Amino acid sequence: MCTEAEQPSPPAQQQEQGNPPLCKAQNPKPARLYRLVLLFVAGSLAAWTFHALSSTNLVWKLRQLHHLPTAHYLQTRDEFALYSVEELNAFKEFYDKSVSDSVGASYTEAEQTNIKEALGALRMAQDLYLAGKDDKAARLFEHALALAPRHPEVLLRYGEFLEHNQRNIVLADQYYFQALTISPSNSEALANRQRTADVVQSLDERRLESLDSKRDALSAIHESNGALRRAKKEAYFQHIYHSVGIEGNTMTLAQTRSILETRMAVDGKSIDEHNEILGMDLAMKYINASLVQKIDITIKDILELHRRVLGHVDPIEGGEFRRNQVYVGGHIPPGPGDLALLMQRFERWLNSEHSSTLHPVNYAALAHYKLVHIHPFVDGNGRTSRLLMNTLLMRAGYPPVIIPKQQRSKYYHFLKLANEGDIRPFVRFIADCTEKTLDLYLWATSDLPQQIPMLIQTESEAGERLAQMQSPNVAQRSSILEFYESGSGDIP
């Protein structure tokens, strides 16, 4: 029974039907609504908890994949052999969303100005191209690319110009690929890539076959050949000189040779610069004595290699994984807590059955990139990665490849492109260096009239004059070698 104070004023219809009046305290509507809200909240919490628990493993894997090149960097089977199809699809959605978010991000005022100017230059370049003024069009295309190097429209149109006007299908395909990594839904870039991808792959394969032919020609020269022995000795000095030079060492080639031959100090140079050269010497001797003949390369081998690289510079850090976070330009390597896992994965990849089916140059270049991307050490990552690359090449019958220090900017540019999604330009760069090294060996051991391969030049006129010389005599050979040893200039 309701008290008088609780009595409501029921509608007349309810009273006529004889239904007893409801008290406010007995009204079921608020209680029912309250129960529904509780059920909804509980259901939402349960669904969220289930989703979080079921996706924890995938999220952890995605976090680990952030630290190593993804399928957009390397071949899918290189990195995703341990993941299911569902996880791969989830990662693809994760990647595509992150790309879309980055494309949709707001630009700074300066970036907006550059993009506006770049698109204007792009329209002018297309008009000039249609008018037959190819040279002016090329300069404007390059200007647009410099202003907006990651704008899909600029990459796409410049790629089309390179493909159809310059007949440079390899570089055109590279720009189409870049456009797709930035804008995966770009139908024009996708159509262009479908047209060029197979052609470019065929060209790359033919290039590798050519390298194999030159390697076989070099392998046919007997070890007792005096010219070959001299070329190997010279290449040894060159390799150390250029590898430490890439990292900023200021020693000249003559000074590097003097330190290695006499073990005497060079006036005016720091102790660290001396020790960097001696460390590389120790590491290369370790490769020749131990690693070239090994079947598998292990983490321990890489640590021993690094221990020698830093043996004279920083013996405490040599052969040890870093314990702090490092930053390399725009690249943020994985944290120290992730290094053990990533290096174990790297070791498995190095010795996997699939890796053994890769062409030696591809395999060595990929190993170089993977290791430098993990960046497991405080210092010496680049030198150790290049030494590992040459170890793998030497096991396949190739000579140690020289990456000239004058190519430092290109070297880092191609590594940056790999970080952005396309490893192929870096592999081609390593193939270029491999071919130049092979050409020098073959020329040094040949008495047949042929064009002289020039690896380094100081000025264009001298480079052209020397490159045009046929069948050089002894004096000419000597002058060319001195010219090469000067250590300045660029790869033509």
Curated annotation (Swiss-Prot):
Q: Which SUPFAM superfamilies match?
A: Fic-like, TPR-like
Instruction: List site positions: Important for autoinhibition of adenylyltransferase activity.
Output: 247
Here the segments flagged for biased composition (Low complexity) are 1-17
**Subcellular compartments:** Membrane
Q: Which GO terms describe its molecular function?
A: AMPylase activity; ATP binding; Hsp70 protein binding; protein adenylylhydrolase activity; protein homodimerization activity
Task: Print the keywords alphabetically.
Answer: ATP-binding, Hydrolase, Membrane, Nucleotide-binding, Nucleotidyltransferase, Repeat, TPR repeat, Transferase, Transmembrane, Transmembrane helix
Q: Which domain of life is it from?
A: Eukaryota
- TPR repeat copies, ranges: 118-151, 152-186
A Pfam cross-reference name: Fic
- Enzymatic reactions: L-tyrosyl-[protein] + ATP = O-(5'-adenylyl)-L-tyrosyl-[protein] + diphosphate; L-threonyl-[protein] + ATP = 3-O-(5'-adenylyl)-L-threonyl-[protein] + diphosphate; 3-O-(5'-adenylyl)-L-threonyl-[protein] + H2O = L-threonyl-[protein] + AMP + H(+)
Q: Per the record's keyword annotation, is Nucleotidyltransferase included, yes or no?
A: yes
Q: Where is the active site?
A: 375
- What is the topology of this protein in the membrane according to its UniProt annotation? Single-pass membrane protein
What's one GO BP annotation on this UniProt entry? visual behavior
- What are the EC numbers? 2.7.7.108, 3.1.4.-
Q: Would you tell me the Gene Ontology cellular component terms? A: plasma membrane
**Residues that bind ATP:** 247, 328-331, 379-386, 411-412, 419
Can the keyword Nucleotide-binding be found in this entry's annotation?
A: yes
Coiled-coil features, chain-numbered ranges: none
Short sequence motif named Inhibitory (S/T)XXXE(G/N) motif, residue ranges: 243-248
Q: Which residues form the Fido domain?
A: 297-432
Ranges that cross the membrane? 33-55
Activity regulation remarks: The side chain of Glu-247 determines which of the two opposing activities (AMPylase or de-AMPylase) will take place. In response to endoplasmic reticulum stress, mediates de-AMPylase activity. Adenylyltransferase activity is inhibited by the inhibitory helix present at the N-terminus: Glu-247 binds ATP and competes with ATP-binding at Arg-386, thereby preventing adenylyltransferase activity. In unstressed cells, disengagement of Glu-247 promotes adenylyltransferase activity.
Q: What is known of its domains?
A: The fido domain mediates the adenylyltransferase activity.
**Which protein is depicted?**
Protein adenylyltransferase Fic
